[in-house]
Design a protein with these regions (language model features):
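Flexible helix-coil transition and linker loops at the boundaries of alpha-helical arrays
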Residues: 108-121, 149-166, 199-211, 246-251
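Short alpha-helical DNA-recognition segment
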Residues: 17-36
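Helix-turn-helix repeat elements of alpha-solenoid scaffolds
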Residues: 89-109, 134-155, 186-199, 229-239, ...
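A short, Lys/Arg-rich alpha-helix, primarily the initiator
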Residues: 1-16
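Structural motif corresponding to the intra-repeat A-B loop/turn of tetratricopeptide repeats
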Residues: 17, 134-136, 183, 228, ...
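DNA major-groove recognition helix of helix-turn-helix/homeodomain DNA-binding modules
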Residues: 47-63
Length: 311
């Protein structure tokens, strides 16, 4: 395999996409930093390099970088906070307090060591605070919009699919759509997801490496379509998500796609299909230790089809 300097790698991909240095680096660093990187004269922080690679539709595991002690601590805390966000979504109510307290402690440590000009880390802190603190949906939305504009200053809901985003930024936009959904603005949420999915599908060149990225957006979009009573579209998208999960071995959201299809088929009157999918969703949720959603599916199966799962 041919070795290539990181700057050359980034320059080639940038030119392939027809992007200027200014377009690529907006909100992340100055154009002069990109110029120096492409000429091999400077290497920005790992946070910024990862964001640039992701905006180019490239994974960040194709290069190695020496980390300072601060960068290493920041990366470790951010990783643990993200892991706890997943644990919190899966946890039963009785287990959530411990996870929240640990997340708050890690967030406070991260805030203490994060550099003021590290927009990427500051953005992550603001996003986590929006969902962790006791905020109304309106307050959450304000915080998330403030967070996305730290690195995408010209962000606008009407032109999402024309932007250029890192994985963190697409996760943020996904969160913005989720809050609109919670507020009852289903059409707004669906339009955000539609644009975001279009962006992900057109920009992520290697689905095998970024399957989780596609599945996250597709999963939440399918839920919003169902809430908007667009059941056939929801099933179609959930089936695509299911196929991607199986084909690329990304199973975190697999039971979610199964349960979305189950409920839609039940609403559409296809009870046999719904029953089979509910059972599959339940046992996959149990296998990945997602007790919260396993209980939810168990209840839906009883409420909708008067069937019980004996464990």
């Amino acid at each position: 395999m041919r070795e290539m300097f990181l700057g050359e790698f980034i320059k080639n991909r940038r030119m392939e996409l027809g992007l200027t240095q200014e377009q690529l680096c907006e909100g992340i660093c100055e154009p002069i930093t990109i110029s120096r990187l492409e000429n091999g004269k400077q290497t920005p922080s790992r946070n910024r390099i990862n964001a640039l690679l992701q905006r180019l539709g490239l994974p960040g595991d194709r290069y190695y970088a020496l980390l300072s002690k601060n960068e290493k601590e920041v990366a470790a805390l951010r990783k643990e906070i993200r892991a706890d966000e997943i644990r919190l979504r899966r946890a039963l109510e009785r287990d959530q307090t411990e996870i929240r307290e640990r997340m708050m402690k890690n967030l406070e440590q991260l805030e203490a060591i994060a550099e003021a000009d590290d927009q990427i880390t500051q953005q992550g802190i603001l996003r986590s605070r929006a969902f962790l603190d006791d905020q109304s949906p309106e307050e959450q939305l304000e915080m998330l919009l403030r967070a996305i504009k730290l690195t995408v200053p010209r962000f606008a809901l009407e032109t999402i699919d024309r932007g250029l985003y890192s994985l963190d930024e697409t996760t943020l936009i996904n969160g913005i759509a989720s809050v609109y959904d919670q507020m009852g603005e289903v059409r707004v949420a669906a339009e955000i997801y539609r644009q975001l999915l279009k962006y992900v599908e057109s920009h992520d060149r290697d689905l095998a490496e970024l399957a989780g990225h596609f599945c996250l957006v597709a999963h939440n979009y399918a839920i919003t379509l169902e809430r908007g009573k667009r059941y056939e579209e929801s099933v179609e998208l959930a089936q695509r998500g299911w196929q991607v999960c199986v084909e690329y071995g990304h199973y975190q959201l697999l039971p979610g796609f199964l349960s979305i299809m189950a409920e839609c088929y039940w609403i559409l009157g296809e009870e046999a299909r719904a029953r089979d999918l509910y059972y599959q969703a339940y046992y996959v949720y149990k296998a990945v230790r997602d007790e919260k959603n396993a209980v939810r599916v168990q209840k839906e199966l009883k409420d909708h089809l008067n069937l019980e799962i004996h464990v």
